[in-house]
Curated annotation (Swiss-Prot):
Name of the protein in its database record: tRNA1(Val) (adenine(37)-N6)-methyltransferase
Taxonomic superkingdom: Bacteria
One BP annotation, GO: tRNA processing
E.C. no: 2.1.1.223
Origin organism lineage: Bacteria, Pseudomonadati, Pseudomonadota, Gammaproteobacteria, Enterobacterales
The entry's keywords: Cytoplasm, Methyltransferase, S-adenosyl-L-methionine, Transferase, tRNA processing
Function: Specifically methylates the adenine in position 37 of tRNA(1)(Val) (anticodon cmo5UAC).
Stored InterPro entries: DNA_methylase_N6_adenine_CS, SAM-dependent_MTases_sf, Small_mtfrase_dom, tRNA_Adenine-N(6)_MTase, tRNA_adenine-N6_MeTrfase
Pfam families associated with the record: MTS
Subcellular location: Cytoplasm
GO cellular component: cytoplasm
Family, similarity comment: Belongs to the methyltransferase superfamily. tRNA (adenine-N(6)-)-methyltransferase family.
PROSITE patterns in the record: N6_MTASE
Known catalytic reactions: adenosine(37) in tRNA1(Val) + S-adenosyl-L-methionine = N(6)-methyladenosine(37) in tRNA1(Val) + S-adenosyl-L-homocysteine + H(+)
Length: 245
């Protein structure tokens, strides 16, 4: 999975079918986002909304995973990140299916009256603390501009009755997010706890909520096997994306 085998661009991350430049974005491409983009359920999806799109990674991954009739919209508050996400989308094979909006999700409205079968977000999760080097990075890391209650409210305004709202969070913050979501009328439908190996405790959790009640399916994913190779589960989930897998 190393990118060192070939002379690849250094200002971003090269996947099998697209490139994500992220040098103008506060938060870079990482495993959390890749897991979320590969994991989110897509059955019956016709419209996707990516909240807090950053470089556009999730929008691009969902465009790759879905059919030509699926429209993906990405909303990003930061002007530089939104511009780079738009450039990444335009350079991809799915330029005609991805729209990037530079806007505050609290005020944003879709260009057409519609709701989304899938809403996805890799949200900030740090409470305000030690200042970051730039205000752009503070916005991406801290919940001051997009707290979790507001995120849940915004998702509720845009989702279909049978739709899924998917996030990735640290386990402890994810558990608190679940309780907040339930108090606001959401139902947890899918949960995958992610650990580095089978012997280590989970450090991230992938969550899918719906306005509609139903059975909750839970499982666990180890990224690496006993010999530190990528596990079968991780490989099966991400091999359509990682360049050297």
């Amino acid at each position: 999975m190393s990118q060192s085998k070939f002379a690849l661009p250094r200002n971003g991350f090269t996947f099998k079918r697209f490139f994500v430049a992220h040098d103008r974005c506060a938060m870079k491409v990482g495993t959390d986002g890749i897991l979320l983009g590969a994991w989110a359920p897509i059955a019956g999806v016709k419209h996707v909304l990516d909240i807090g799109a950053g470089s556009g990674l999730l929008a691009l991954m969902l465009a790759q995973r879905t059919g030509d009739d699926v429209h993906v919209e990405a909303v990003e508050l930061d002007e530089e990140a939104a511009a780079q996400a738009r450039e990444n989308a335009l350079a991809s094979p799915w330029a005609s299916r991805i729209e990037v909006w530079q806007a505050d999700i609290h005020q944003w409205q879709p260009s057409q009256t519609r709701r989304y079968e899938l809403i996805i977000s890799n949200p900030p999760f740090f409470a305000e603390g030690v200042p970051c080097a730039t205000s752009q990075r503070e916005q991406a890391r801290y919940t001051t501009t997009l707290d979790h209650a507001s995120l849940l409210t915004c998702a509720a305004e845009h989702i279909t009755e049978e739709g899924f709202f998917c996030v990735v969070l640290p386990v402890d913050i994810g558990n608190a997010f679940i309780e907040r979501a339930r108090a606001m009328g959401w139902h947890l439908r899918l949960r995958t706890d992610v650990a580095e190996t089978e012997l280590r405790p989970p450090h991230r959790v992938l969550l899918a909520f719906s306005p509609t009640a139903g059975e909750c399916f839970s499982d666990r994913l180890a990224i690496r096997g006993p010999e530190q190779q990528y596990s079968e589960g991780f490989t099966a989930l991400t091999e359509d994306f990682y360049l050297f897998m």
